[in-house]
Amino acid sequence: MSGKCATLKISGHDFGCRAVAYFHSEKGRANFTVALDDPADHSHIIAFSGEYGRRTQDDLYMLSIDRMELNSKDRPKMDGLPVPALELSDGMCRQNGNFARLEVSSITCTATDKKGRQYQLQFVSDGSPITVRRVRASAPTIRHDPYQ
């Protein structure tokens, strides 16, 4: 989604954002993921995550947040990628717009983790159509690894 973060706060600290994306897994978990504009850490990513999303109107999607996923350059890596820390949280995300029409006008998220840290996001679209990509897990296509 293209646009700008009018607000992005983590524990009272203000950040800019480089990108905002929505992910929905085949198992039902959904995330609003934000890549932070943090010159000290290009791996600084947070995700507002939950399993109970619902469309209350044609142009309003709500996601109950039950955990925050926190990633940074200091996190342990698996297959070369940082593994996020999971913080149990309570919150809500509201997306105004319609995925079917490729229109999202805004996303607002607030959450508080069990340690009392607060997370806030206010994203405003620039009006461009969103890009939708469908990614599915599949079996490996390499039958024998020649490097083993």
Short names for language-model regions:
Residues 21-23, 35, 80, 96, ...:
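Short, well-ordered helical secondary-structure segments
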